[in-house]
Every structure is written in C-alpha cells, then in structure tokens.
C-alpha cells in the first residue's frame, strides 16, 4: 500500500487499533482459508466429525471477517446485506453438529463458554440493528436447547422479536453483563445512562477469558487474532430502549454508527424479507419456502404456496408455522 492508501485506510477505520497493512493481509488470509476449507470438506466428506469441525471453522472465519470489515470502516449498507452469510454459515455448522450429536436441538453455542456466549450475543445484537428479519434464524441456533430460556440478557434482547420469551432472574456470566441488566431494569433515563457508562467502562477487562483478548498487540503480515473489540449488545440495548447515547457514543467499544443506522432505517419490511409470516394449520401456505413451528429446528419443512399447512402433535403447544427462508 502506498502512503495515500494507508492514510485513507486509517481515516476510514472505526477503531484506532487496526493496522491497515494487517487488515489487508487478513482479508487475503480469510479468502485463501475459505478455499482451503472448501477443499477439506471435499476430502473429508465421509467423516462427519471432520465435517463439523470444518464448518465451525468456516463460520468463525466468516463472522470474524465480517467484524474486521466493520472495524475497517466498510459501509453499513454492504455489511447489512452480507450479514446473512454469517447466519447461514452458523446454520450449516449447526446442521452437521446436530447430526453428529444425534440431537436435533443441539445448540450451536454453549452459553457456559464465554467465547460462545459473546459471539451469540453479537449475532443477536447485530441482527437487531441491521437485519431483524434474521433473528428467528439466529434463535434457531439455540432454540429448544438446554440454554433456551435460561439467560436473562438473551431473553431481554430477543423478547420483542421471538415469542414466548421468559422473565427470569438468572444468567451465565455475571460481569460485565450485570451492568447491562441493571441498565435495562433501571427506572429512569439517567440511571440507565449511568449503568450503560459503567458497562462500557468495564466491558473489556471482563473479556479476558476470550481468545481474542489483547489480540491488537499482535498484528502482523503473517496474521493475528484481532478483528475489533465491540460491545455489540450495548448498542442493541441503546437502540431497543431508546437511550440518549450522547454521553457515551464515542466510547472506544461502542459501535455508535450501528445505533444511528438502526434509528434512521426502518426494519426491512415483510414484503422484502417475510420472516414474520405466521400461519395456522388448515390455512394455505402464503409463500413457497422453508417453515418451522415455534423456532424448533426439528419441525422445519418445505411447503409450496397454496399448500395446506398441517397440524403437528408437539409437546410445545399450539402449532404456529413461521416462515424461515425461500
């Protein structure tokens, strides 16, 4: 890169830690790694354990590249479109992992592990801000699993979008998330802002257990683990609870432009992304595609427009078919 390109990259980046040369090297790495992983899938197609591991690596790479592109300053309109690729990669991983485990509701994320928990909250939060139509699919990654309905922050983030969320007083990781739960539960705008400031102030030091912690110190032409430090869930809460973020919007880990984008752009409408279609048994299918009952992955089936939707005898209650994808 020449000096002009370097300066342009520095000005565009959303976080000052990102080295432009490292960014361009990592983009090349992820693209090459994608080719290598696809070849590994071909070579190991008969070994389900290996297929699961490879799809997990693919999903990690796609999400990390998405985050790195955000950190580098890519336009949100482009990232909004590409976020579906991240979700689809995790769906493929979940599909093969569930086959391997012999459990149709096996979770793609283990909330007891901080890396998994942070990443799941990131997917949910980014979707709230950019692609609310993808939230049912993201929830499908942990729906009906041992972690579904067990974490207060997850329930708070998803309750406006996913039915049958619970009011609970338990969570998997106390700090820093206690500050954010306090923010949600506070009675006044002033208290919420103070709690959010505490959350952002303390967020990074409690991420020490994550594999990417302090990765900005090891950026080089041969790679590294840094793709940005972002408290995505703080932005989601600020948006959902309409917080005035003037006093904390310039905090290093607060993705302020995502909140501004979400406030300026209405959610993608149902005609473009009809993920919110709901149909009862005996009613005609309004759109050809994949449907499932209550975000329960094992019920997923494909129906043709005009086909009568069936009743299923489930222990989860009434059958309500929800559109997933074309």
Regions found by a protein language model. Give the residues of each.
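Residue-level detector of short, conserved catalytic/binding motifs and their immediate flanks
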Residues: 121, 235, 289
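Extended, polar beta-sheet/loop recognition surfaces of beta-rich domains
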Residues: 297-326
């Amino acid at each position: 890169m020449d000096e002009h390109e370097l300066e342009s990259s520095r000005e565009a980046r959303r976080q000052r830690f990102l080295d432009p040369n490292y960014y361009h090297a990592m983009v090349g790495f992820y693209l090459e790694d994608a080719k290598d992983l696809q070849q590994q899938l071909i070579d190991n197609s008969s070994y389900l354990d290996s297929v699961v591991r490879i799809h997990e690596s693919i999903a990690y790479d796609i999400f990390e590249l998405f985050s790195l592109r955000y950190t580098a300053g890519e336009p949100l309109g482009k990232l909004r479109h590409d976020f579906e690729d991240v979700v689809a990669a995790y769906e493929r991983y979940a599909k093969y992992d569930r086959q391997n485990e012999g459990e149709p509701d096996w979770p793609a994320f283990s909330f007891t592990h901080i890396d998994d928990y942070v990443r799941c909250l990131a997917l949910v939060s980014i979707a709230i801000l950019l692609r609310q139509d993808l939230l049912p699919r993201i929830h499908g990654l942990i729906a009906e699993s041992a972690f579904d309905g067990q974490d207060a922050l997850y329930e708070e983030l998803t309750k406006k979008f996913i039915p049958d969320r619970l009011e609970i007083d338990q969570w998997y990781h106390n700090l820093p998330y206690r500050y954010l739960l306090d923010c949600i539960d506070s009675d006044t705008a002033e208290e919420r802002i103070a709690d959010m400031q505490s959350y952002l102030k303390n967020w990074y030091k409690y991420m020490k257990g994550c594999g990417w912690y302090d990765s900005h110190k090891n950026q080089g032409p041969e790679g590294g683990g840094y793709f940005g430090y972002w408290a995505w869930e703080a932005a989601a809460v600020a948006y959902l609870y309409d917080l005035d973020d003037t006093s904390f919007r310039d905090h290093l880990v607060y993705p302020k432009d995502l909140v501004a984008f979400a406030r300026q752009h209405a959610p993608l409408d149902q005609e473009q992304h009809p993920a919110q279609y709901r149909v009862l048994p005996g009613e005609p299918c309004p759109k050809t595609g994949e449907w499932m009952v209550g975000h329960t992955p094992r019920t997923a089936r494909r129906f043709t427009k005009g086909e009568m939707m069936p009743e299923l005898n489930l222990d989860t209650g009434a059958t309500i078919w929800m559109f997933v994808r074309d």
